Amino acid sequence: IDTAGKERVLHSFGNGTDGSEPFGGLVALGGRMYGTTFRGGATNGGIVFSVDTAGKERVVYNFGLGSPVVPDGRNPESTLTVLNGTLFGTTYNGGVRSAGTVFNLNTAGDESVLYNFGGPGDGAHPYAGLLALKSTLYGTTSAGGAHGEGALFSISARKERVLYSFRGGSDGARPDGGLIALDGSLYGTTYKGGAHDRGTAFSASTQGKERVLESFGSSTAGGADPFAGFYVLNGTLYGTTTQGGSHRQGVAFAMTRAGKERVLYTFGSDSAGAAPFAALTDWNGMLYGVTAAGGATNHGTVFQISP
């Protein structure tokens, strides 16, 4: 899609073996784009695929083909991360404990499980992808942890460490979105928890010291229930919430690193869409995003907004 809104379909999923339900975004590597689907493929456990700009798709890896002794991951939901020419990602299900995995994969389709979630006090079922900082990967899980409300973790050289376990109270619960790094700190959101149980924005050190920046749901105009993580532009955090706002259909917002929030746009009042679940991105100084509903056919929109 170009900035004027002209769209071209590159590939239509749905024949089964090529994957279905692509929840995550795309990353570029070696002249092709790589992504994941939650279902479909050889075992209906999802795939990693590549596609070129002409729309030629190739299945790179089928999840769910591991042996009973060393089971593979299943159902990847997130965008992949590229580190040193290798693809890294998470699966929501599968693995030794059926609680999800961290994996890496080369473009030839050789996959390796780096970590299996679900041990005592460990995170479980990651929705989000991974953040690469030098040789360490950081991420979140939507469940598990010491209190069962999700966890913040790091993984390096196949060794995982839980940095923070969410308690489900004022500190937040269900960190479904991904992390971003800014000036040495990690920033993210939780879908629930906080002072009003409508989600939080938080920062954390790479050692796991967490601080709540904002508890969503404090006013009618403000957003609530953020599913996506942040996008950084010129030192400011930008995000979306799936609900809240004066029309209760979500908002796009800006936030300082100190937690001061400013609503940029309230969804639900016109054809711009409703319920933005995904993170924002930018092009030439403008922010772009998608909504899951609303628009002329009520099937969602691609929108542009000024920061």
Predicted region positions:
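Extracellular beta-propeller repeat domains
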Residues: 1-307
